Design a protein with these regions (language model features):
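Periplasmic-side early beta-strands and strand-to-turn transitions of outer-membrane beta-barrels
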Residues: 164-165, 173, 190-284, 317-331, ...
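Transmembrane beta-strands of outer-membrane beta-barrel pores
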Residues: 172-178, 203-207, 247-251, 303, ...
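Extracytoplasmic beta-strand/coil segments of soluble accessory domains associated
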Residues: 74-117
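N-terminal periplasmic "start-of-domain" segments of outer-membrane beta-barrel proteins
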Residues: 22, 32-65, 94-95, 110
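Outer-membrane beta-barrel translocator/receptor signature
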Residues: 94, 108, 121, 130-133, ...
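Short, polar/charged loop or turn motifs at beta-strand boundaries
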Residues: 53-72, 97-100, 120, 174
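Structural signature of Gram-negative outer-membrane beta-barrels, strongest in the C-terminal barrel
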Residues: 232-236, 350-353, 365-367, 424-596
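Short acidic/polar hinge/loop motifs at secondary-structure boundaries
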Residues: 115-141
Length: 596
């Protein structure tokens, strides 16, 4: 039916063009009229066309993406104004900025929906666009309809519908510089007027661009692959079921970073690693591996006066990052971070139908996310000597320099390597209720007013565990009387274990005025509140555990020393370590509050 309509329209346009130009066009002129298929993508929330909304919108069609080689969100930066997603590190580093608003770590400030299903964690934002129909980018806060983490804007990605297109797509790409290669195949089949499906997959790989100066190997190689099944069933004229399931796997080298030299305040002339400045020269491979599973069901029921939509989504992410954190050819310290994430989401919306003067949408949404993170830090030989042993000995040296009459103190760590464990469970629950109404042709034709309000509740918690074990010797050297006192085989066991809880309530209003000069031109003023949700910065635990490590080592010294010496040692340390003896405040260090 759609093809027949397009054929009739093409004939009418061709006839009209011929009638208007038959007397003016030269006889040897050939005029070609190219009409693209019109694809209508419905949204459960918006009550009007995206281009007519009182917000800044960029729409990228599949033709736009193919012409500009858009294969991931990171490529969109070259095409969409005020949008930036830096391409560095790995797929884990998926910070997005719209109008300068974004977040490099923790929760994002820009939201992402794929086929109306939210991607809650930005670790899943970087994926392949092999079967994408359209991308919508809304700039500015979208908190009233979309809630948390849309303070900067919103990205909506739509896969191609097997009802709007049938056939088999095969795409092949090759690039010489990095030996980039990719292939994708997707088949779209319309079984009947009531059922259609698509199934496809892709593979891509690259040898990378950056070489390690130590071994000559490229460090940013990559291989990825995945597939997706999309099925749509129309049991009746007013009921639609849209199901998707997909999996993506990537294994890549990453983090082609290099040492930039000593910062201001350090002795640059006697810098230890001067020869490695500006060179990729780490001695441990940096890698990132991710498995990403997504599935969702969109149910749409069209009643006489409203449209009911129910969207259910589930996401599973398992990844592993290994990083040589010193980025030097020395054994200082490494980190191995693993994430295991499961998210289930549900959203039910009612919106108006066939009502031009008053358009409205009401909805309720919620999700629950389980996230388990492990991030042990391994201090290698140089790290034990320079960072753990060296930092404390530098403090002891400063004590003696400030007061030469005090005894000289030093310690010797006996471990060749020290492992600092880190295990974190950070579940998040969120639910919201919202309504938005638009009144068209208010007072005068072309003037519309949009008002909305969202009430959102969010609850989160963190169970944390981090520990270590250090064996060391301590030495005390007194001048008068000359005396060397060793305290051997001391042991310190720093430990951080506990639970934090936080919850927030947010009201997200919206008010917008729009005047339509014509169907293609309008002017609007919009006031909207957006917010970035709070959470826990587990990366700060490395600083906390190092502080606790120093305290536990000093406590071990004081417990071993005679009572007469213990008081003297503790007094000297307190003058130069003001945080010694103070209880570590985990909440103050790791909890970050919502931003508006």
């Amino acid at each position: 039916m759609r093809k027949n309509i397009l054929f009739i329209t093409s004939c009418l346009l061709a006839t009209t063009t011929f009638a208007e130009n038959i007397n003016t066009l030269p006889k040897d002129t050939t005029k070609v009229i190219d009409i693209e298929d019109v694809v209508v993508i419905a949204s459960p929330k918006e009550t009007g066309k995206l281009r007519e909304l009182p917000t800044a919108v960029s729409l990228l069609s599949q033709k736009d993406m193919q012409a500009n080689q858009i294969t991931t969100l990171k490529n969109v930066s070259s095409l969409v104004p005020n949008f930036f997603m830096p391409d560095y590190g790995s797929r884990l580093t998926s910070a997005i900025y719209i109008r300068g608003i974004g977040s490099r770590i923790n929760t994002p400030a820009v939201g992402l929906y794929v086929d109306n299903i939210p991607y809650i964690d930005k670790s899943a934002f970087d994926f392949n666009f092999y079967d994408i129909e359209r991308i919508d980018i809304l700039r500015g806060p979208q908190g009233t309809l979309y809630g948390r983490n849309t303070m900067g804007g919103l990205i909506k990605v739509h896969t191609r519908s097997p009802f709007s297109y049938q056939g088999t797509d095969v795409k092949l790409s090759y690039g010489t510089k990095s030996n980039y290669r990719s292939v994708s195949l997707t088949h779209y089949h319309r079984w009947s007027d009531c059922f259609a499906f698509s199934a496809g997959g892709y593979y891509e790989g690259s040898d990378g661009f950056f070489r390690n100066s130590l071994n000559g190997k490229k460090v940013d190689n990559m291989e990825a692959g995945g597939g997706r099944i999309h099925a749509i069933w129309l049991p009746s004229e007013n009921l639609k079921l849209d199901f998707t399931i997909g999996y993506d796997y990537s294994d890549e080298g990453g983090y082609p970073y290099y040492y930039t030299g000593a910062i201001d305040g350090y002795d640059k002339e006697n810098e230890k690693y001067k020869n490695y400045t500006g060179k990729i020269s780490y001695d441990q491979d940096c890698t990132y591996r991710r498995g990403l599973f997504n599935t969702g069901l969109n149910i749409e029921y069209q009643a006489q006066k409203f449209i009911l939509s129910a969207v259910t989504g589930f996401q599973n992410l398992n990844d592993r990052m290994f990083m040589d954190q010193d980025f030097l050819p020395v054994s200082i310290y490494t980190i191995e971070q693993k994430q295991r994430l499961n998210t289930i989401s549900e959203e039910i919306t009612f919106k108006s139908k066939n009502n031009k003067r008053w358009q409205w949408v009401t909805g309720v949404s919620g999700f629950y996310q389980w996230l388990h993170t492990t991030g042990p830090v391994n201090f290698m030989e140089d790290g034990v000597t320079d960072m753990i042993e060296g930092n404390i000995n530098n403090t002891f040296k400063k004590i003696h320099l400030d007061n030469p009459r005090t005894p000289e103190m030093s310690l010797d760590v006996l471990n060749n390597r020290i492992r600092v464990s880190g295990s974190f469970d950070t579940p998040v629950f969120s639910t919201a209720l919202y309504h938005q109404s638009t009144f068209n042709d208010l007072f005068v034709k072309g003037l519309s007013v949009t008002a909305g309000l969202r009430l959102e509740y969010e609850k989160m918690s963190m169970n944390y565990f981090s520990d270590s074990n250090i064996d060391f010797d301590f030495f005390l050297k007194m001048a008068m009387p000359p005396l060397n006192i060793p305290f051997r085989n001391l042991n310190a066991t720093p430990l951080l274990e506990g639970k934090e809880k936080n919850d927030y309530v947010q009201l997200l209003p919206k008010l917008a005025f729009k005047y339509d000069f014509s169907p293609a031109n309008n002017m609007y003023v919009s006031i909207t509140k957006g917010y970035r949700s709070g959470g826990y910065n587990v990366q700060m635990f490395s600083e906390l555990i190092q502080s606790d490590m120093q305290q536990k080592m000093i406590e071990a010294i004081l417990n071993k020393a005679p009572e007469s010496m213990a008081g003297m040692i503790e007094g000297m340390i307190k003058q130069h370590m003001p945080n010694y003896g103070k209880e570590l405040n985990v909440q103050e260090t790791t909890v970050y509050k919502p931003e508006y």
